[in-house]
């Protein structure tokens, strides 16, 4: 049971620490006996000697623990999603079957594992993912929303771990897939921090010189950028305080990937990008005064600095389908520089930063259940126009009126049903 021969000394320490953290993350969703049961299954898998390191030399148990920690802490998955992550290796190596998992842990965990296995089979059949058809088929196969969330968490974790690998071709394939497939999925689900991390790491691995060129420029201009931000926000802070508003402000440097995209789109060098940062005003507002105080802040900012009305984005009156709420406006600041200002409340900020995890916290949800209304709106966004009205909890039958088939050459084609 305690055979740790697959583990280095550092991995042993990391595994114990991760397991403890995960247990704390999902403690409020565990039933009596759950913790002992999952620990026994994981230890049995280790002792079976059926698990092997992957192409990058990464330990599958440690990877599962890292992914489970990310999924629980940064996305908000609870008992069923986390257990599926920890048990997935057992299924792949044939140590256990999905039916056996169902008997031990319940139908919900088994359903997630079936979804993960279906997508694993899809990858084996057609590993080429550079098509919109593949993305749609992937979503169609994932009938449980948590499958997609786990795949995003798994890819973020993998991208974090392969930094020093010598398998450059495999690293490139993983990075291209992260950029093309998983970053857009994370974006649609409101997981903006994970989306930015996937994009930045992909750029770092695929366009090494461009990534470090931008990073060095950002480091070199940090002092002047910070001084400008202080000059910009000082009069706003004074007016907001005089208005009796509770708030804090911060400057946020835009991601390296987004700066690189602007440079390519505008066909200019780093010095030609004017909006390297955004100012975020975060209000401590009671729920019933959120909209009023956001618009009051908007009025104060635009009275002080000339706005560009074409750059107004109002996601407070009509939030994005993934739950994002914020006012965006671009104004002309000191030295005739355009500055993007984002206005939102503490609640809106946490949702913008943490996506699903924040929604679940604000709803006081202790398990993955009870989120069908919000997840239904996410699903509607992913469906991109389908007329389905009835949405089962966590279901994502995204192409009910379409059929996907493989050609003899392995290409994916989409047809009306």
Give the ranges of each region predicted by the language model:
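Alpha-helical phosphate/pyrophosphate-handling elements in metalloenzyme active cores
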Residues: 28-99
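Short, hydrophobic/amphipathic alpha-helical patches that form generic packing surfaces
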Residues: 83-89, 115, 151-158, 184
């Amino acid at each position: 049971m305690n055979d740790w021969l697959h583990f280095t000394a550092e991995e042993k320490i990391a595994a114990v620490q991760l397991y403890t953290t995960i247990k704390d993350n999902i403690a409020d969703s565990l039933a009596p006996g759950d913790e002992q049961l999952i620990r026994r299954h994981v230890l049995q898998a280790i002792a079976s000697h059926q698990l092997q390191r992957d192409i990058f030399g990464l330990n599958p148990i440690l990877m599962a623990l890292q992914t489970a920690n990310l999924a629980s802490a940064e996305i908000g998955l609870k008992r069923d999603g986390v257990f599926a992550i920890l048990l997935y290796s057992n299924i792949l190596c044939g140590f256990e079957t999905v039916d056996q998992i169902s008997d031990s842990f319940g139908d919900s965990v088994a359903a997630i594992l079936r979804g993960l296995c279906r997508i694993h089979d899809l990858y084996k059949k057609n590993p080429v993912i550079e098509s919109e058809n593949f993305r749609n088929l992937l979503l169609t196969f994932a009938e449980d929303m948590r499958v997609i969330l786990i795949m995003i968490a798994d890819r973020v974790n993998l991208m974090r771990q392969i930094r020093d690998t010598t398998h450059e071709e495999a690293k490139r394939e993983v990075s291209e897939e992260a950029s093309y497939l998983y970053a857009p999925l994370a974006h649609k689900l409101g997981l903006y921090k994970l989306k930015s991390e996937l994009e930045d790491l992909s750029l770092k691995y695929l366009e090494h010189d461009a990534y470090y060129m931008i990073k060095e420029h950002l480091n070199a201009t940090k002092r002047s950028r910070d001084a400008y931000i202080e000059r910009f926000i000082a009069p706003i802070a004074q007016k907001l305080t005089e208005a009796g508003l509770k708030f804090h402000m911060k400057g946020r440097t835009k991601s390296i990937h987004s700066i690189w995209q602007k440079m390519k789109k505008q066909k200019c060098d780093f010095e030609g990008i004017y909006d390297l940062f955004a100012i975020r005003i975060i209000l401590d507002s009671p729920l019933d005064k959120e909209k009023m105080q956001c618009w009051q802040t908007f009025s104060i900012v635009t009275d002080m600095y000339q706005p560009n009305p074409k750059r107004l984005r109002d996601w407070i009156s009509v939030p994005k389908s993934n739950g994002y709420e914020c006012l965006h406006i671009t104004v002309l600041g000191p030295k005739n520089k355009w500055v993007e200002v984002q206005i939102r409340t503490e609640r809106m900020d946490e949702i913008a930063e943490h996506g699903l995890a924040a929604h679940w916290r604000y709803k006081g949800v202790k398990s993955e259940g009870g989120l069908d209304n919000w997840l239904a709106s996410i699903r509607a966004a992913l469906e991109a126009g389908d007329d389905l009205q009835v949405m089962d909890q966590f279901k994502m039958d995204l192409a009910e009126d379409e059929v996907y088939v493989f050609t003899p050459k392995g290409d994916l084609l989409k047809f009306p049903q």
